[in-house]
């Protein structure tokens, strides 16, 4: 996260650190057995850390899990990595609530333009060079209207399944290593860090987020056992 500060150790109990090997991502624990992230973070081998704050110093209640099952949209365009950028991971074993682990509820309402949103992750803190912090960083940004979002990504398919968030003056943004992490707007889990401009935190391109609310039927169907459910078009 560019332009943020170290997260409070107690404000990200749902934040998962995904370590696929060559790079890393984040995810969000949505119940004791499921983590929600983005499809472009998928790799063959992956470790999932829960209850993590300082990467070099484990918490007493830190847990490590592995994917038992991974679900991406069956109607996703495989030739276009940014299409339907969402993935559900079923953990090999459930986790229990603890001082540093607790799930985040899915949203009950869609996001609204202008909302103040909170983003977090272990991604680089510098837009010009890879500077990965030992602790997650948090920042506040705003949900941007669709007209501005489409204008920033002219020619790219910015759909109703995505939205933009950032700050108009630049300088605060998600970046490399933050993919898959949550965007929490007005207390609700509304977005998943997906992708952005070639240079983070630079105008006029706020980052793009997968809109969780649009995928609620798919998420709920998969968790309920309907593993052939399709995503919205």
UniProtKB/Swiss-Prot annotation:
Organism (species): Bothrops alternatus
One Pfam match: Trypsin
Subunit record text: Monomer.
Domain Peptidase S1 residues, every copy: 1-224
Cysteines joined through disulfide linkages: 7-138, 25-41, 73-231, 117-185, 149-164, 175-200
Catalytic residues as annotated in Swiss-Prot or TrEMBL: 40, 85, 179
Protein name: Snake venom serine protease BthaTL
GO terms for biological process, alphabetical: proteolysis
Function: Snake venom serine protease that may act in the hemostasis system of the prey.
Coiled coil: none
UniProt family annotation: Belongs to the peptidase S1 family. Snake venom subfamily.
């Amino acid at each position: 996260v560019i332009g943020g500060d170290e997260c409070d150790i107690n404000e990200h109990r749902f934040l998962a650190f995904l370590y696929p090997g060559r790079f890393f991502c984040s995810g969000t624990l949505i119940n004791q057995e499921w983590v929600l992230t983005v499809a472009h973070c998928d790799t063959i081998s992956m470790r999932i850390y829960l209850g993590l704050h300082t990467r070099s110093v484990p918490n007493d209640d830190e847990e490590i899990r592995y994917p038992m099952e991974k679900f991406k949209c069956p109607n996703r365009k495989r030739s276009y990595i940014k299409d339907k950028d969402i993935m559900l991971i079923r953990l090999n074993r459930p986790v229990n609530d603890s001082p540093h682990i607790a799930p985040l509820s899915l949203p009950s309402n869609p996001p609204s333009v202008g909302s103040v949103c909170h983003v977090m992750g272990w991604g680089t803190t510098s837009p010009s060079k890879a500077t990965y912090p030992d602790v997650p960083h948090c920042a506040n940004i705003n949900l941007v209207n669709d007209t501005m979002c489409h204008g920033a990504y002219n020619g790219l398919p910015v759909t109703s399944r995505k939205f933009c968030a950032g700050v108009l003056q630049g300088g605060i943004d998600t970046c490399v290593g933050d993919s898959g992490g949550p965007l929490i707007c007005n207390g609700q889990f509304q977005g998943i860090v997906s992708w952005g401009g070639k240079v983070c935190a630079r105008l006029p391109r706020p980052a793009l987020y997968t809109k969780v609310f649009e995928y609620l039927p798919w998420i709920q169907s998969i968790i309920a056992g309907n593993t052939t459910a399709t995503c919205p078009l």
